[in-house]
Amino acid sequence: MNSGFFIVFLFLPEKCVRIFYIIYMYDSSFLPGNCYGRTEVCSMTLKDIADLAGVSMMTVSNVINGKTSRVSQKTRDKVNAIIEEYGYVPNLNARSLSNKKSHIIGIIISLDEKDVLRGTNYFENPYVSTMIGAIEKELQKNEYFTMIRSVSKNADIISLLKNWNVDGIIILYPAAGEYMAKLMDSATCPIATFDCELEHSNLINITSNDEKGLYLSTKYMINHGHSAIAFVADYKSSHVLANRFNGYKRALEENHITFNPDYVYEYSPSYEGGIQAGREIASNSSPVTAAVTTADICAIGIMEGARLGGYRIPVDLSVIGYDNLTLCQYTLPKLTSVSQNIPQKAKLATSLLLEKIRTGSVSSSCQAALDVEIVDRQSVISLY
């Protein structure tokens, strides 16, 4: 193959001269815009792929962006084979400029004042990490990226919306209804939340049946012969925990068990809060034989606190958690828990958010409440 080179002089203003050496291979595959089989220097364009495949640039664009309803399978395979062979990667910046989308979703974790004072790191919370992982998985499937930020002031969310170049945001632990209404009025992009108390026609909000969740766990204890059942969580701190507390009381009432406020331990539904409750149950020689709570991490703390007080789990104290996180399988004994199907919550919220970003609306309701169920393991003993 013959080859040669040219020295190209480019004269710029102010008598500035820059010299570019361009190696020109007489084989045109080395021209700028091609890869010549070397992906590390690939600068291939849609036109290059179209020329190699013998199709239009629009067809190549449709294949890359998944708009293939009018593209034959043979053409798709041919275009994809060229993309793979030459290591072509779409330029996201160029795509963003052309369709005015950043392909970035902001994930905001809203901290309350108690969390800030306690120095809570929500990224260490298994529920949060599981939820973010499930969201990121769905976004990745749709070629979206994430920006994650925790905020301690509600006003920070509005500030982030103004300064972040995001196509939409997902809020974990959303603020009270009044502030969320204000946020929705000032929002410049679609918003999705989980377990928000605000009902707004434009807000995507995915919840689970919280009241039913604690109803099921309490009834499960009752069906195994327990009547002195503790509830562990500061239920006054959020509407979600309040709903779960109502489920606990409903199960007692339906089974003619008198509610005893002494069996309510108003600790944070965290590992540390669980340890405090477990220690207290064990040290007071309480008649309590079972404990239900609103988070798996708290349930694990209850088991550890009770053990430190000399109790055996589940012989002396049966425990049921909430969330059915993977770590339930690694405790000793394995933790029985209420499943609210976190992956499904994440998938539904993400799909509705992306649909709204793409079309401006959603084909179904923005509000959805998923069902819950008990996942039986080893942390409950029958007294019968």
Located regions from the model:
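Flexible loop/hinge segments that line or gate small-molecule binding clefts
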Residues: 172-213, 297, 323-335
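Short, well-structured alpha-helical segments in soluble
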Residues: 154-165, 274-286
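Amphipathic helical "hinge" segments at domain boundaries
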Residues: 30-31, 47, 89-158
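Hydrophobic alpha-helical signal peptides and transmembrane signal-/tail-anchor segments
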Residues: 1-13, 17-25
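Periplasmic-binding protein-like
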Residues: 106-107, 167-172, 230-232, 264, ...
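N-terminal helix-turn-helix DNA-binding module of bacterial transcription factors
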Residues: 16-103
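Flexible loop/turn connectors
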Residues: 279-384
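Hinge/beta->alpha junction and helix N-cap segments in small-molecule ligand-binding domains
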Residues: 113, 121-127, 145-156, 206-216, ...
